[in-house]
Amino acid sequence: MANDYPSSDEEIMEAQTGSRKRRKTSSDSESDTAPRAPTATSISRVKPAKDRAGHQAASRVAVSKASVPEENGKEKVSFASIDVAPWLVASLASMEIKRPTGIQKACIPEILKGRDCIGGSRTGTGKTVAFSVPILQKWAEDPSGIFGLIITPTRELAIQIYEQVKAISAPQSMKPILVTGGSDQREQAIALASRPHVVIATPGRLAEHIKTSGEDTICGLRRVRFVVFDEADRLLAPGRGSMIPDIETCLSVLPPKEQRQTLLFTATVTPEVLALKSQPRAPGRLPIFVCEVDTETLATPASLSQLYLQTPVTHKECYLHVLLLTPLNLTKSVIIFCNRTKTATLLEYMLRMLDHRVTALHSGLKQQDRISNLARFRAQAARILVATDVAARGLDIPEVGLVVNFDVPRDPDDYIHRVGRTARAGRPGNSVTFIGQRDVELVLAIEERVGGKMSEFEEEGVSVEGRVVRDALKIVTEKKREALLNIEEGRDVKGNRMVGMKKRRVVE
């Protein structure tokens, strides 16, 4: 099928949030169901977060945390000390990965012992290495295909995992393949039939192969030794746009769970994920290993500075232009998150007209454009990436200095995933959330979830409002109008008319 499931950013968010209570959107989301503004005529500061301990105790299933080996000045834990094979230790060292993170120290030894695993850790802590290393080590001891299947919700995540597995396994003749939407299905069927060692797939496209490609293509899946669900909370979320039907199709051709190891990794350990722990085990099977490292107490990175900026809905683009040009942010790599594809498209067009080096990533783009745009941003050919929540999870984009929430996310967990794109691996980072009068309830829910309070963005000695009026109001309004016209006329971001493209109307 041409597109992976779900096909739109709204459906992607539905799949991620599942049956959790929806929060109403801001007025910029073009919805009549926006939350009612507070009675106060203005907000000078966001209210402090409430004590969340009672709420968390009531809403989450209690899980005993795995004990993680501690490092001290005398003895530091290494990959060799947790039984990783020498060739893998050398391969990781060549990638400048020399010491295991908390999730890696806890999970790798247990997976090597043959245990199923549920691993939870915040973004940027090396979960991909935590499941890739034991799979590669076991494969090297008994090479066969298809040895491992890794299922992940988005194409970009699948590509990233594919590249990382390929890099780690470089010293060996390992053959991984990608099975995602947006690529030729016939070529993928041939690759699957050739018995690759590891398959990295999105659930929609793999399910399509299982239904249509024939037994010769999928028979290798019947002997899989490892199955990994990356971003498991999103894969298993119920509700509209759920990926569960496709996952059930994938599981239908795999060996019984007693004959394979199942690994689930996520930054957000949801009740749907934890429910798998209580499933009955076959006699003689080791208990499921459950490890949560920093999923609650450090949901956002310690080196992250979380800021907010009050913006009138009618002039948000002006404030964004000014924010990007402040001396503090002028050289930073920036990701701007929007709730809607239309908003992301408009911002990309407008910012390009304002001479920013910008690209975009969202479900409205063709697969090849998504790949090339992400590559441009990673190579710093583009300084700014305008994205929807397609880019919020798992993508390892180094050196992102600033995350801007142009729209307040509807769900607090989406906020955690967004701001987790910066301040990775202990590096400092900033996030700025644009807040309108109707967004206060959403922000308070975010503060309660992360257990902290946002600070107001300030530029020393400068009035942001003054800069907007003086430097941005006229030019940004003009360029926004031009951008809307180009989109309506079916022109691309460079202003060229797209062949065969019908006119599109974008509602402001």
UniProtKB/Swiss-Prot annotation:
InterPro entries in the cross-refs: DEAD/DEAH_box_helicase_dom (IPR011545), DEAD_box_RNA_helicase (IPR050079), Helicase_ATP-bd (IPR014001), Helicase_C-like (IPR001650), P-loop_NTPase (IPR027417), RNA-helicase_DEAD-box_CS (IPR000629), RNA_helicase_DEAD_Q_motif (IPR014014)
Domain Helicase ATP-binding: 108-287
Primary role: ATP-binding RNA helicase involved in 40S ribosomal subunit biogenesis and is required for the normal formation of 18S rRNAs through pre-rRNA processing at A0, A1 and A2 sites. Required for vegetative growth.
Placement of sequence motif Q motif: 77-105
Gene3D superfamilies: P-loop containing nucleotide triphosphate hydrolases
Enzyme nomenclature, EC number: 3.6.4.13
Name of protein: ATP-dependent RNA helicase DBP8
Region entry Disordered, spans: 1-68
UniProt biased composition (Low complexity): 57-67
